[in-house]
Amino acid sequence: MGKIAGLVVAGGGGSRITNSVLPKQYLQVRGKAILQYTVEALFAHPKIECVHLVVNSKCEVHYLPILRNLSGYVVSLSEAGNTRTDSVFSGLKALECLNPSHVLIQDAARPFTTPKVINAVIKSLLEGCEGVVPVVPVQDTIIKREPEGIVTDVNRDELRIVQTPQGFDFCKIFAAYKAHFMCPSKRYTDDGSLALAHGIKVECIPGDSSNLKITHPFDLKFADFLLAQSHR
């Protein structure tokens, strides 16, 4: 078995967090940056040997202290692109020299990914899955608004909320990204969708409702609550 690498997409420059001038991945919860929690969660799995961060060099003053805190781990960097897809491709190109067998692609602002989810993704990959995406059921009622203003019901039993980390056979996802950039015809917001569009077989596994992506002000408060509970 080859190396399993983590790839954390941390190049986002915007934030929906009220009154924040920092990208959300650098905001602190209980004295630690969200990005550091995210990286440490990956390294907590014994099979993940290295983590690559895709960052915006303009945020150097924010990510260098995090790197110092992670000095005991194998962490590398590359420059983020204009879109998430650009950034993931940047990270995959940087990881190519390490020749990993698999890669877990993670959002920077998911600090509470559980060992159970990470282990399930890796287990599925090692059992032969080409791509693995954690998902959770939709709890709310969903409607679809048509252009004419007509609203139709959507069967939520058929829907799932997609989470990360999403795991892939490295060679297959790298080939899919190269094919996409040879003829970019669509914008993708997650790696599983791009993988499916390029012929990779993607399996869904159960995610975890606590694996939230920090996006809104309430998420920060909830993150603080979760950490308070975990340290009791």
From Swiss-Prot:
Looking at the UniProt record, the site noted as Positions MEP for the nucleophilic attack sits at R156, K213
Q: What InterPro entries is this protein classified in? A: IspD (IPR001228), IspD/TarI (IPR034683), IspD/TarI_cytidylyltransf_bact (IPR050088), Nucleotide-diphossugar_trans (IPR029044)
In its UniProt record, a GO molecular function of this protein is: 2-C-methyl-D-erythritol 4-phosphate cytidylyltransferase activity
* Enzyme class of the recorded protein, top EC level: transferase
Q: Tell me which residues are marked as the site Transition state stabilizer.
A: R16, K24
The annotated pathway is:
Isoprenoid biosynthesis; isopentenyl diphosphate biosynthesis via DXP pathway; isopentenyl diphosphate from 1-deoxy-D-xylulose 5-phosphate: step 2/6
| Its EC number(s) | 2.7.7.60
Pfam families membership: IspD (PF01128)
Q: Which GO terms describe its biological process?
A: isopentenyl diphosphate biosynthetic process, methylerythritol 4-phosphate pathway
> What reaction is this protein's catalytic activity?
2-C-methyl-D-erythritol 4-phosphate + CTP + H(+) = 4-CDP-2-C-methyl-D-erythritol + diphosphate
Q: Keywords on this record?
A: Isoprene biosynthesis, Nucleotidyltransferase, Transferase
What is this protein's function? Answer: Catalyzes the formation of 4-diphosphocytidyl-2-C-methyl-D-erythritol from CTP and 2-C-methyl-D-erythritol 4-phosphate (MEP).
Q: Which HAMAP family match?
A: IspD
**The family this protein is said to belong to:** Belongs to the IspD/TarI cytidylyltransferase family. IspD subfamily.
Output this protein's name.
2-C-methyl-D-erythritol 4-phosphate cytidylyltransferase
Q: Which organism is it from?
A: Neorickettsia sennetsu (strain ATCC VR-367 / Miyayama) (Ehrlichia sennetsu)
* Gene of this entry: ispD
